[in-house]
Amino acid sequence: EPLALGDPDKRVRRVAWCSGGAQGFFHEAAGLDIDCFLTGEASEFVTHLAAETGIGFLAAGHHATERYGIAALGAHLAEKFGIAHEHIDLPNPV
């Protein structure tokens, strides 16, 4: 189940996004004048940092945030190098 933290009425202009388990980059991204940080996983310390900084935090699931990017990369490499490519998406609840 996705996790959304922050003020739902706050206007979001700048988003930092890193797929998978990148919640550890929240502190670094917070220094980039962002309004929201989107990643796959949450950690307890990040929920506190989000509240302290006023930056929205979205954890949409590790698998969910990586599945389309890796499929696009495979298709790109197949086209660029003329190789066969098949993306196999194995559902993962994490």
Protein language model regions, located:
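Hydrophobic structural segments
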Residues: 1-94
